[in-house]
């Protein structure tokens, strides 16, 4: 692939790519169109495509973009990229048409081409949990001084990361992205595309074991971020994580550590829980405060503080930004309703983040009943029963007044909790969401604190919405 010239402020105006650029980036085969043809942007969704954009036909789990090529052309697409020749309609000679073996790989190649046009730092964040909060917190801190570009929500996969990079514009000074994975090789590919200068790993835990097999597999996958940083890249790792702490012996590139009560460059001590958050001492010199009662958010804050210092922010500005940061939606977001308190952690779940959330619920200072509404943890493979049963035992020993489980896997949790001595009347299992809503509607009392958590596929946000509407 021919490397494009570095142009810091070179992407201006309406037209972004020429057909020649696309062919250089992807190595695709030109079927029609003039090399000087220019495109206003890249689209993978015919519903939102704008005139003069290039349409990539991507096959997803529930759709195939090749089925929408005709619609994209009707809406004014100036060209198409496809991988299934039998589904590609004939186009006019002036419409660009490019064949590639894999359109997802082509999207990544175009995104890398675009990223190389900008001489700006890219900060990449991965980990088994805490990616999104750390990304949002780091971007929030850095935006006090810089124009920061970031993923929207959790666009952290082989489609979302390229789309994020493709929306970098000349006004941006920094890009902060999270990298997700549930299969071997994805972090390696994402780093090839994003070419990060600073890599942050929040932790290593039992997540996506269905495809990564075990925690060692998770470690091998996540550590690809450190191995593939653009030279002389800097790695920033959580020393409170046992697996990551071992990397202090690796000298292939600069590695800095953050942690809680650890011997490291960015250290939090003197943790003090308050009704509205946590205060802590940064490097025994600066008192910091966060508006969250979850201890792991101190670790997330330490990563954001380190980013601020790396990029020249003064400690006073960093302190103010950290103090005013608000949690992303659906991630331990405390919602105070008239009758009860809802802790919305409904976006996703794995053993590590579930334990953190349960511990937060147990520390909550409000005096009402503590209710855990738990949905299945997905992608745990042959460890699924073991982990769900483990949490039944764990919960039975915690000051939790009521356990409500939902889904086929979490039934192992309710059964384990009962066998471990939790009162039968304090355990309710529901097969589906409608039964959960029916139970909560009849049984939630004034002053109760509800933690709602489950994997993305469980759509636990439906329960959060119900509680808001009920209030």
Please describe what each predicted stretch is.
Residues 14-124, 133-144, 166, 419, ...:
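Short, basic phosphate-binding NTP loop
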Residues 19, 25, 83-93, 200-342, ...:
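Acidic, Mg2+-coordinating active-site environments of NTP-dependent enzymes
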Residues 125, 329-333, 457-463:
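ATP-dependent carboxylate/acyl-activation modules
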Residues 69, 73-74, 191-192, 396:
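Non-catalytic positions within long, well-ordered alpha-helices that form the structural scaffold/packing
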Residues 12, 23-24, 105-235, 239, ...:
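Phosphate-binding loop of NTP-binding sites
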Residues 62, 328, 346, 350-422:
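Active-site beta-alpha connecting loops in nucleotide-dependent enzymes
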